[in-house]
Amino acid sequence: MAAGAGVLGLGLGAFAATKPGDAAKGKDVFDGTCAACHNADSTDPKVGPGLKGVFKKAAMGNKKKATDASVLEIINKGSGGNMPPLADQLTDQEKVDVIAYLKTL
């Protein structure tokens, strides 16, 4: 399955025109938007958890398995802690690209 294709398959109307995720573009978005609070190269926390291997873990800090849908929900709504909702700050394509990048960690 192409990275990001799971998001497309969720029936989320907003993502109907979104292309499969591009991990290289997702890294650029991560570096500009997420890296201030999240480590990509370790599981050590900054303000938020380190995200290395997040899609390989049995569960994230919220006790949910990292899936395209669960990560997209956190990106859009925030985590209820320090993570702000980014639904209006990132385009749908940027979100899919970040998810593709996170899968490479």
Residue ranges of predicted features:
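Post-cleavage N-terminal segment of exported redox proteins
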Residues: M1-A23, I74, Y101-L105
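Residue-level recognition of conserved structural "scaffold" positions that shape functional pockets
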Residues: G11-A16, T33, F55, P85
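Electrostatic cytochrome c docking/interface patches
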Residues: L12-D31, P45, T67
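The canonical Cys-X-X-Cys-His
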Residues: G26, D31-A40, V98
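Extracytoplasmic electron-transfer domains, predominantly the class I c-type cytochrome c fold
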Residues: A36, P45-K46, G53-L105
